[in-house]
Swiss-Prot record:
Keywords: Chromosome, Coiled coil, DNA damage, DNA repair, DNA replication, Nucleus, Transcription, Transcription regulation. One of its GO terms (molecular function) is histone binding. The keyword Cell wall biogenesis/degradation does not apply. This is FACT complex subunit spt16. Residues 937-950, 963-976, 983-994 have a biased composition (Acidic residues). Residues 951-962 have a biased composition (Low complexity). Component of the FACT complex, a general chromatin factor that acts to reorganize nucleosomes. The FACT complex is involved in multiple processes that require DNA as a template such as mRNA elongation, DNA replication and DNA repair. During transcription elongation the FACT complex acts as a histone chaperone that both destabilizes and restores nucleosomal structure. CDD domains: CDC68-like. The keyword Transcription applies. GO terms for biological process: constitutive heterochromatin formation; DNA repair; DNA-templated DNA replication; nucleosome assembly; positive regulation of RNA polymerase II transcription preinitiation complex assembly; regulation of sister chromatid cohesion; transcription elongation by RNA polymerase II. Forms a stable heterodimer with pob3. The spt16-pob3 dimer weakly associates with multiple molecules of nhp6 to form the FACT complex. It is found in: Nucleus; Chromosome. GO terms for cellular component: FACT complex. The lineage of its organism: Eukaryota, Fungi, Dikarya, Ascomycota, Pezizomycotina.
């Protein structure tokens, strides 16, 4: 049991006292409900997630507010006895010492101890009388329940068992204020979901003539219960309503098209939703208390259907009028039957067998069914579900069609009042105007024209990009018309980027020199003199590690220097003396970026350095080492602090308490938790995911509100199947900061040599290998289904936060080097990703400002791709060494997702470029923006009109940029080697045509001919 469990002691004793008062009064009654029992046994076995609420767990919730599995309650008029485990017993301890004694008997794994507790309970039952109240219809299972049943059967032969469920039904029937509020809130949630969501979805589907099965529509309604925002917006629900406390009591069930089942056990089938009679019903539970609602909707109804629904409304009103204090339950049913016999006797056989039942913790109280035999009297404060319905009525106007048979139902949840009912579900209209829809006479609505972008994206996504070594077959030989369209589209995108940049940065001045100005951070070594260490009295140099301070004696006084003011310290020897030189930070030193820091007052006088002399060589060497170490530690702490700046503390994960969370077992986590690599399991909770490690109860929580992207990558062509979560803000996993959390399972089993296996003697050839391959394919397909289904469940649970599953398009992927190794990079709908091996790459497409293709020139086998982000302070991302065969595919994809791109023959120094952009972004866009990147590619294509470049580089600057890019860029050494090979070829004097002829000749000699392919691309 969870630690948060707190039992309301006052409520427990109030309800127990009222129960005991009714029990004592019943002993004097001429019509005993309790059957003359001297004791009552309530047995709870193993909890079953699928089981409905019955009298035994209803008793637990009514008295304790919680369900205690594997627990025995024995009630006598003198005391209550509880048999349970020690863990559960500690939650029941506060109940001791009340006005009714509560004795707790603790069981352990020791069978003898459990037997002693059971024997004591049986002795108590015997001493209370020869009749004991039990619940024979409740199905309890589990070892604890079986042990009790076996022991009781052996030791209680002379004790008579009496069904106590009518007495419990009477005790639960009249609700107190808290119970009524919970049922009212559940009812308002039902009404809101029916009228504000289901009706809208149903009418939209019918209006747009979309096909959807009952099961699929039910699943949509089912998922809506997790939408806290939806329920919080419902006007009738109070401000204190907690949307996390609602759950399904039954359903939702949606039926149409001639097949109807009005029982609570009905389920939605796989038939499509059809016009005509549509029935929808469901029940919602709030704080364990239920409410239910059902409505019949008439879509283009026939006259017969309209007439019968109007009559059903009259029946409903007639029953409702008599729902008041003092009415006999069977009179409600008889009134409806009498009205049918008077008005429409042909419908008597089609009328439902009861007009409702008691409702509360149990969805349907079997001891309070409103049929023609129930003689119980209604009392003010009772809650009922009132149901009127007609089943399998033949429509004479639709004879021969599958919709000729129809059913109708109306269900409301009500409270019995002194003078009439209080209808809790009245906000979902049931009059003819509210439930009738007419689409038949309307004109067919025009279908909206889909945007061109969507079609283009899907076309690109479904196309395979062929890779081949033959030049004439490469995608560089592209359709001229397509290239012209792409070039035109790119010009539009470039102009749009410039306009957006001017609008975005209008009135801004940018950062000074392209660097965000750092703020001066104050530091203080000591607040008072008495905080100085005692060793300063010796007037020696002292390094105070605790205060991060170096204390230097100057003119007989200890002077502290905080380590943040010190640049470095060094020791040198000269003759018999050793010299310690301490250099301080001051403005204008021309130090590197790492040491760059702001100063409070640049006009102040600064101390540049101190030199101290001593004959104690070892002492000064130690001091120099201590200062260096202190400085190193200070820088490390500062760096760690800077790294952790964007780590935001997450909210608490809200765990699912009332049912088992959906789990994905046997998955590994990346980045892994510290320690041994073992598989754990992922659980879906109310507001996030939890990865549970089997060791040390470690876990990692990921909240839906922090999920930026959710990816599912199948195991096709891969060794693993995975679900990857890319976060908005980083979290800590162990001691690592990460923005990416991945759950994966290996898709291949360990291979082993079967030599010596007896099966080998009887099977030869490739049969075993073929079977193994078939099994491997089946297993991979099953893995993909399992992980995809789990990813979709994550998306459903997190849909309020906009979580959606994205799957990479492998067919339009390309290889490249984003970090150290060559990997497959794949586009998705919203991102460009590499998820197979760490470090992962996730680039969100809508955050990209522009893409630039580097080293695009004839003779090179690969090129580089640089993404510049809309946040100019973010470093551009490089993907290097992409094969030139992928060039056209990459361009097509960039164009299809509306990313402006340019290309050029060189690697650029992006650090310098971004400093220029950030220093004056408005000026940058006013001077043409990114057009300087396109200048090279435009001239290469032979364009007559050249735009003036906003970022002109001289030859020396280009050379410098090329040199510096070797340090800045992360592509491998092949690129520069290939560039030098090309320049050597150029010097030989062979032109393009000569090179092409030689290449074709070489291809033909290898048995290949490319004469059938299209013309060469003009340069």
């Amino acid at each position: 049991m969870a630690e948060e469990i707190v039992i309301d002691k006052t409520l427990f004793f109030n309800r127990l006292s009222s129960f005991y008062a009714a029990w004592r009064a019943d002993k004097r009654s001429s019509h005993p409900t309790f059957g003359g029992v001297g004791s009552i046994v309530i047995l709870m076995g193993k909890t079953d997630e699928a089981s409905t609420f019955q009298k035994n767990n209803a008793m637990h919730f009514w008295l304790l507010g919680y369900e205690f599995p594997a627990t025995l309650l024995v009630f006598t008029l003198e005391a209550v006895y509880v048999v349970t485990t020690a863990k559960k017993a500690k939650h029941l301890e506060p109940l001791r010492g009340g006005k009714i004694p509560v004795e707790i008997l603790i069981t352990t794994k020791d069978p003898e101890g459990k037997l002693r507790s059971f024997e004591k309970c049986i002795e108590v039952i015997r001493s209370a009388g020869n009749k004991v109240g039990v619940l024979p219809k409740d199905t309890t299972t589990g070892p604890f329940a079986e042990d009790w049943k076996r022991t009781f059967a052996m030791l209680s032969a002379e004790i008579e068992e009496v069904d106590i469920s009518p007495a419990l039904s009477a005790a639960f029937a009249v609700k107190d204020t808290d119970e009524l509020v919970s049922i009212r809130n559940a009812s308002r949630a039902c009404s809101g979901l029916m009228s504000e969501y289901f009706v809208e979805e149903m009418s939209r589907l019918l209006d747009e003539e979309k096909q959807m099965t009952h099961k699929a529509l039910s699943a949509r309604v089912d998922a809506k219960i997790d939408d806290a925002k939806f329920f919080n917006k419902l006007g009738k629900l109070p401000a204190e309503f907690d949307a996390q406390q609602i759950d399904w009591a039954y359903g939702p069930v949606i039926q149409s098209g001639g097949k109807y089942d009005l029982r609570l056990t009905a389920v939605s089938d796989n038939s499509n939703l059809e016009p005509g009679i549509i029935i929808a019903g469901f029940g919602i539970r709030y704080k364990t208390y239920s409410s239910m609602i059902a409505r019949t909707y008439l879509v283009d109804p026939s006259k017969s259907q309209e007439t019968n629904y109007a009559f059903l409304l009259a029946l409903h009103e007639a029953v409702m009028r008599d729902v008041r204090d003092g009415t006999i339950a069977k009179d409600l049913y008889n009134k409806a039957i009498n009205l049918i016999r008077t008005k429409k006797p042909e419908l008597e056989s089609h009328f439902v067998k009861s007009v409702g039942a008691g409702i509360g913790i149990e969805l349907r109280d079997p001891n309070m069914v409103l049929n023609g035999k129930n003689s119980r009297t209604l009392k003010s404060g009772m809650t009922l579900s009132i149901t009127v319905g007609l089943t399998d009525v033949e429509d004479p106007e639709l004879k021969g069609s599958k919709s000729s048979t129809y059913s109708m139902i109306i269900t409301d949840t009500v409270r019995v009042g002194e003078n009439g009912p209080h209808v809790f579900t009245k906000d979902a209209g049931l009059d003819m105007d509210s439930v009738s829809f007419y689409f038949g006479d309307e004109e067919e609505p025009q279908k909206p024209i889909k945007e061109k972008k969507e079609a283009k994206t899907s076309a690109i996504a479904s196309r395979n990009i062929t890779r081949t070594k033959l030049r004439a077959e490469r995608p560089t030989q592209i359709n001229e018309g397509a290239e012209a369209r792409r070039r035109e589209h790119q010009k539009e995108l470039a102009a749009k980027k410039t306009r957006e940049g001017l609008d975005r940065f209008a009135g801004t001045t940018g950062d000074d020199n392209g660097v965000t100005q750092k703020k001066f951070k104050r530091f203080e070594s000591y607040k008072r003199d008495n905080q100085l260490p005692t060793k300063v009295r010796e007037l020696t140099i002292y390094v105070d590690q605790k205060a991060s301070t170096v204390i230097v004696p100057i003119m007989g006084r200890p002077v502290p220097f905080h380590i943040n003011t010190i640049k470095n310290a060094s020791k040198s020897d000269e003759g018999e003396y050793a010299y310690l030189r301490i250099n301080f930070l001051s403005p204008g030193q021309g130090v590197g970026r790492k040491d760059d820091q702001p100063f409070e007052d640049l006009s102040a006088h600064f101390l540049r350095n101190l030199t101290l002399r001593s004959k104690d060589n070892e002492r000064l060497a130690q001091v120099a080492q201590d200062i260096t170490e202190l400085r190193k530690n200070a820088l490390r702490r500062e760096q760690e602090k800077k790294e952790m700046e964007d780590v935001v503390e997450q909210d608490k994960l809200i765990e699912i308490r009332n049912r088992r969370p959906v789990k994905l077992p046997d998955v590994y986590l990346r980045p892994p938790l510290d320690g041994k690599r073992v598989p754990g399991e992922v659980e879906i909770h109310q507001n996030g995911l939890r990865y549970m490690s089997p060791f040390r109860n470690e876990h990692v929580d990921v909240l839906f509100s922090n999920v930026k992207h959710l990816f599912f990558q199948p195991c096709a062509h891969e060794l693993i199947v995975l679900i990857h979560v890319h976060l908005k803000t980083p979290i800590m996993i162990g001691k690592r900061k990460t923005r990416d959390v991945q759950f994966y399972r290996e898709a291949t089993e360990m291979q082993f040599d079967e030599t010596g296996n007896r099966r080998r003697k009887h099977r030869y050839g490739d049969e075993e290998e073929f079977e193994a391959e078939q099994e491997e394919r089946r297993r991979r397909a099953a893995l993909d289904r399992e992980f995809k289904a789990f990813a979709e469940k994550i998306a459903d649970a997190g849909k309020d936060e906009g979580v959606d599953v994205d799957i990479p398009f492998r067919e339009i992927g390309f290889t490249g080097v984003p970090n150290r190794s060559n990997v497959l990079i794949q586009p998705t709908t919203d991102a460009l990703v590499q998820l197979t091996e760490p470090p992962f790459l996730v680039i969100t497409l809508n955050e990209i400002e522009i893409a630039h293709l580097e080293r695009v020139q004839f003779g090179l086998k690969n090129f580089d791709l640089v993404f510049v982000f809309k946040d100019f302070h973010r470093a551009p991302v490089h993907i290097n060494t992409i094969p030139v065969e992928s060039l056209e595919g990459v361009k097509d994809w960039l164009d299809s997702v509306d990313i402006a791109f340019t290309e050029g023959p060189l690697n650029l120094n992006w650090t310098t470029i971004m400093k220029t952009v950030v220093s004056d972004p408005y000026g940058f866009f006013a001077d043409g923006g990114w057009s300087f990147l396109a200048a090279e590619s435009d001239s290469e294509d032979g364009s007559e009109e050249e735009e003036e470049s906003a970022f002109e580089l001289s030859e020396s600057e280009l050379a410098a940029a090329d040199e510096s890019s070797e340090d800045d860029s992360e592509f491998d050494d092949d690129a520069s080697a290939e560039a030098s090979d090309f320049s050597a070829e150029e010097e030989s004097g062979e032109d393009w045509d000569e090179l092409e002829r030689k290449a074709k000749k070489k291809d033909r000699e290898g048995g290949l001919d490319d004469e059938e392919h299209g013309k060469k691309r003009k340069r």
